[in-house]
Amino acid sequence: MKDLLNLLKNQGQIEEFDAIRIGLASPEMIRSWSFGEVKKPETINYRTFKPERDGLFCAKIFGPVKDYECLCGKYKRLKHRGVICEKCGVEVALAKVRRERMAHIELASPVAHIWFLKSLPSRIGLLMDMTLRDIERVLYFESYVVIDPGMTTLEKGQLLNDEQYFEALEEFGDDFDARMGAEAVRELLHAIDLDHEIGRLREEIPQTNSETKIKKLSKRLKLMEAFKDSGNLPEWMVLTVLPVLPPDLRPLVPLDGGRFATSDLNDLYRRVINRNNRLKRLLDLSAPDIIVRNEKRMLQEAVDALLDNGRRGRAITGSNKRPLKSLADMIKGKQGRFRQNLLGKRVDYSGRSVITVGPTLRLHQCGLPKKMALELFKPFIFGKLEMRGLATTIKAAKKMVERELPEVWDVLAEVIREHPVLLNRAPTLHRLGIQAFEPVLIEGKAIQLHPLVCAAYNADFDGDQMAVHVPLTLEAQLEARALMMSTNNILSPANGEPIIVPSQDVVLGLYYMTREAVNAKGEGRVFADLQEVDRVFRAGEASLHARVKVRINETVKEKDGSITKNTRIVDTTVGRALLFQIVPAGLSYDVVNQPMKKKAISKLINQCYRTVGLKDTVIFADQLMYTGFAYSTISGVSIGVNDFVIPEEKARIIDAATEEVKEIESQYASGLVTQGEKYNKVIDLWSKANDEVSKAMMANLSKEPVVDREGKTVEQESFNSMYMMADSGARGSAAQIRQLAGMRGLMAKPDGSIIETPITANFREGLSVLQYFISTHGARKGLADTALKTANSGYLTRRLVDVAQDLVVTEIDCGTEQGLLMTPHIEGGDVVEPLGERVLGRVIAKDVFKPGTEDVIVPAGTLIDEKWVEFIELNSVDEVVVRSPITCETRYGICAKCYGRDLARGHQVNIGEAVGVIAAQSIGEPGTQLTMRTFHIGGAASRTSAADSVQVKNGGAIRLHNLKHVERVDGNLVAVSRSGELAVADEFGRERERYKLPYGAVISVKEGDKVDAGAIVAKWDPHTHPIVTEMKGIVTFVGMEEGITIKRQTDELTGLTNIEVLDPKDRPAAGKDIRPAIKMVDANGKELLLPGTDVPAQYFLPANALVGVADGAQIAVGDVIARIPQETSKTRDITGGLPRVADLFEARRPKEASILAEISGTISFGKETKGKRRLVITPTDGSDPYEELIPKWRHLNVFEGEQVNRGEVISDGPSDPHDILRLLGVSALAKYIVNEIQDVYRLQGVKINDKHIETILRQMLRKVEVTESGDSSFIKGDQMELTQVLGENERLAEEDKFVAKYTRVLLGITKASLSTESFISAASFQETTRVLTEAAVTGKRDYLRGLKENVVVGRLIPAGTGLAYHSERKRKRDADKPVRVSASEVEAALTEALNSSGN
């Protein structure tokens, strides 16, 4: 019988739907939803607690309070289902209908919907072409509006105040109609003829010239068309009927003590009903106009507060002075319907507890307390007990479990066997924050966690808690085992490197056992095999660190997969031989024949995974951990104050530095250097001193003298505990040791500038009070940052996930030939990331040729794996075009070829992989490790001293790239361009290093010269910016008058005079507009022209420039005629860390961005205007010159007559990504953003694969701006989805019409998320009101393509295993669609069939 009841309960059929449409509800629609009208503001009877009839909780309208029982109790039980009681009018039904039945209120006067009025831009205002202010004056009964002017001089839509209205009445009588309030607005909206207006606007737009007017008109046109297409009527934005929410969604809950807790909505509804009823009465009584007007205004305000409290005027507050929660507040924000209930729900079958270490567990296990397991698996246990016949009913089983009988434990063990559970640690920043384990029952109350997965969870055991979830269905268990098991997640999805890597104790143990010592016990012995080593070590006859020879048998898996076995004798140590016992067959002995530092261990696991596969790697990782723990225990490494050895040289270095600082101070006192230069020099000095101290300290710590077997004293690597911990990578770093045993160094103020006086003491010596005080500055800032950082990082991740959530791999190959050009990433001359690392796991887009030949060595379409990388590097290829998510041409989603390798699995990515979310998590997860600014060593400032020369690291041939230069008399070259670079190539022509050469650098080598390592090939002054002449001649000064535009300074020490150009602000009135310049003339005083142009050679001097030549002096090519001092350098990169990443992803235009050349051509300067210079670029092809006004204070990098290319920097500053996209194109933008973001992460030592950043970039480049509409329906200036425009263009091209032209637009991630096609996704992200208003007006359809939308409607997501479900549904849908064929097609098919049969 019970099952029968359940059957009846589950009768609600789930409707199949493919899209969700949102629109405006017409009054008829609202009435059709309703089950009756709410006429009274009463809720429930305070004595009987029964709902009042016709009130807000009326049972007649909304349904019975108890299941199958009418209100008066006449009809009870199931047999009367569907009967309507004649006494109380209640239908006998389930009580849950009170959650779905709506009611309505008939408003006595129309009311404008506040969302369409106040949500910017105001839709009502835009449609009626009136300002918001004017409409509000009409709505809130301050002015009349003319609805029908009749034959009078008034105009439709004109506002009249009371006086004007009465004057008009006297003048025109009843010839015109003017009203006030929402009914007037409704009449006006009703009167709009959409088709007529659209036609008028389409004609008007091409005839207007002003940009702003066109913008306004096209906005109106868009809105009108939206109304027309969606079938919404404009007058529906004014409500005449108000729907009432079902009562169970705004409940009245009895508290103990006879009081009631109520939802705020009830108060808001009561207010509306009260005012509405009062208004009805007043209208029946035909009360005076002014009273009715006031009541109507109050009704409008009451409805406003119900829909969106606080949107207009002061929010209505409840009894406790806090604003009431309106309908809009219910859906928006973190606590709103979307984020609280639809996207994140609490789940059954879960528990949480503190975690502790489980060093004895295997990698796929976790320890689950028996108490928790019993509770979590209860239903399974009940079922098993009943099945076994140990309990007759569920009730009996329950009793058994409560008593914890012995049988129960046996059953529990059986239930748990092979039933994985999910462990999750909040915050879940990436997908490895939830993994599956097989539970092992343990005593105690804490969950035991395997130490190797701590890195993935970012867990430690200082009181962290974790949650356990039980996958119930077979499918869930299958997915947990196959996809989420910790053993299947060895590689990190962010960079493809192992994440199951030993750390801390384990590393220390492995490092300790693989170190070698001089003259240790047993040195020089030879062993027959590993077993013998083991026996001798256990017998205590040989030390762990003794150097010995061992015969080993190794099985090596070659690159091509073949297996070779060989036996050889190796020089090694006892510990390494012992470690080799656990290394899986297939790896050579060389992998352990080195001190196992953290990097080496990580590399070993990686190599193991690539060579012998997953299963062996997992076993090996476990063995490594057990071994590491064992030997770190044996080592007994500890830390004591005597481990911090302070170098003797420290005092000398510090004294020397102090002396030099005094010297600089005295120079400053006598005015030889400026404040800024002094600051720079002092800080450079101390940075150098600090480095020297730490060098001396590390040299001191890392070596120790020992006596070898011959009795000689030799140096060996130190066994100092602190040094071993840092060297192995177990804990601590050189920087931290420096603070313990060297000197703490320079500290930063909270604003990021560096304090000039360093802390010369270290922690062992102890700090003085002043030093401690300076330290607290940086340290406190560090703590404040950490708190901010977590929130900011979480928000960044949320925005990233939101912008990329619907990016899923949907096909294998999109067939594009586009790609990005990859080159090695070079910074400061070093190759930071070689080409091999950048192309690993990507697909080649264009054939790769052997350098200098036509031979294809890598064909297009190859997925580059480790073997290919070696091959590419062998052939010294230095650039490769690879496919990229940015250039992928798949319409919805992305193709596997453009994405390349799935980093966490090591093969080509599967269809259905949610690459967008993975990218977002990979970028967001390390966010908390990024600083809020750039430095981070207990507040100690890290600042490199400014580079002033290029010293090559490798010998080889010099190559000069893109370098414009002049040759000086002494044969040296002087750079006169900014983008010049110098590279060094080895004998194979491979580029080993590359350096940027600044303007004015003196280069002592020529193209093709051979240099040795360590040679200094270029020099420049880092603190000033020179102006270099490109010709020889005689200097003449123009506009340089002493005391007016320049001042002379004489150097007391050298007696030389310098001329300094005054800032226009400091000049007397006479000199404000004079532009001091240096002109070049020949011996006859005729002015010289710049070579190759007809521009006179003159150099305008900016403010503060120092001129080093005298008037009339003879100068040669390449001489410096003036220097511009550079400003104080703050700590490198003002915005560092997280804010920088956020700025890049939000595509914010930086303040004082660099100015780029809009076209290629010759530079000249036009007439100046107030405070601005006019820069003119004349193109070489003779088209129109381009002019731009640039503020005078901007320092220009170009001189009159210089040639520039489109996109070259004219004035330095941070780059603006929008400019890069506009002038240089998508690939330049991709390169810029990827490199900038990688720089921030690299500084923190975080590795992220480029493709993740490219994936997010793809989403930022989704939109295009239409520049010419052609024959399409787009309007010029529209922002459209790229896919939409491409689709339309294909259609137009087929019909031989003109296609629309467009430019790509870069949107920041927040903006990109909000402009997605899915309104459900956008509304659940941010600005819910705005998104829903816009979607409703345009009658948007959400086709549920993304992940978020499907989560909201409660479906499987279209990614991973859910993709099959969705493709199946799509297949069914397509099969059901009728196919339309034209008559001609049928005819053609018939003739073809006839012909073929005839043959």
UniProtKB/Swiss-Prot annotation:
The lineage of its organism: Bacteria, Pseudomonadati, Pseudomonadota, Gammaproteobacteria, Pseudomonadales. It comes from Ectopseudomonas mendocina (strain ymp). Zn(2+) 2 binds at C814, C888, C895, C898. InterPro entries: DNA-dir_RpoC_beta_prime, DNA-dir_RpoC_beta_prime_bact, RNA_pol_asu, RNA_pol_N, RNA_pol_Rpb1_1, RNA_pol_Rpb1_3, RNA_pol_Rpb1_3_sf, RNA_pol_Rpb1_4. This is DNA-directed RNA polymerase subunit beta'. Zn(2+) 1 binds at C70, C72, C85, C88. Binds 1 Mg(2+) ion per subunit. It comes from the Bacteria. Its cofactor is Mg(2+); Zn(2+). Its EC number is 2.7.7.6. Gene3D superfamilies: 1.10.132.30, 1.10.150.390, 1.10.1790.20, 1.10.40.90, 2.40.40.20, 2.40.50.100, RNA polymerase II, clamp domain (4.10.860.120), RNA polymerase Rpb1, domain 3 (1.10.274.100). One of its GO terms (molecular function) is zinc ion binding.
